Amino acid sequence: MKTILITGFDPFGGEPINPAWEAVKTMDGYTDGDYKVVTQMVPTIRYKSVDTVKAAAEQCQPDFILCVGQAGGRPDITVERVAINCDDFRIPDNGGNQPEDEPVVDDGPSAYFATLPIKNIVNALHQNGIPAKVSNTAGTFVCNHLMYGVCHYAAQKGNIKAGFMHIPYLPSQVVDKPNQPSMAVETVRATSVSYTHLRAHETLS
């Protein structure tokens, strides 16, 4: 049986919840065909985020890693194409770190592209009635940091494919944020189910 490690961040930026972890946490132990899901909550802290995912990966030995993060203000599920080797945090992370124009990995490549089939994932979500699109920027906060760090780790391992998905706010988060888009947690959770099903029942690179 092959393993998909799916991660979600803890709350940050003054929010009481993070839709990424709310959606991901119930997927732990989920199976479809020859694939099983392992989940991991990730701290929204610069280096600790990557270290947490690496530790989980060393334990469960995944074939694929899908990291999930919140992107408040985006109306769709956005599957990230690329992570850049730059930490430029607009606000402090949960550890109080706020680097400016610093590398994620010293002497690392300028960028890493996701090695998951991003357009196939978007198409699978569309087929399940979920609004989604490819995104060409993961920002420069901890989401980009994690995507870059995990892709760097996967490249070093050589046998893991990795990527990142941003999700909108949950409805409860926008009660006091007029005109901000949101998406029900059940819909967000369905994205992980859709990806696992796609992986289990389609031929993907």
Residue ranges and their predicted role:
Residues 62, 168, 200-201:
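Proline-centered helix-kink/hinge sites
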Residues 197-205:
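Single conserved hydrophobic/aromatic residue that forms the stacking wall/gate
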Residues 147-193:
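Active-site-adjacent mobile loop/cap segments within catalytic or ligand-binding domains
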Residues 22, 143-146:
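Short secondary-structure boundary/hinge segments and terminal tails
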Residues 139-143, 168-169:
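Small/polar glycine-rich anion-binding or flexible loop at a beta-alpha turn
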Residues 7, 165, 200:
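Single, functionally critical "micro-switch" positions that shape active/binding sites
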Residues 1-138, 152-156, 180-191:
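N-terminal catalytic or cofactor-binding beta/alpha core of small enzyme domains
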Residues 48-51, 144-145, 174:
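Short, solvent-exposed polar/charged micro-motifs at secondary-structure junctions
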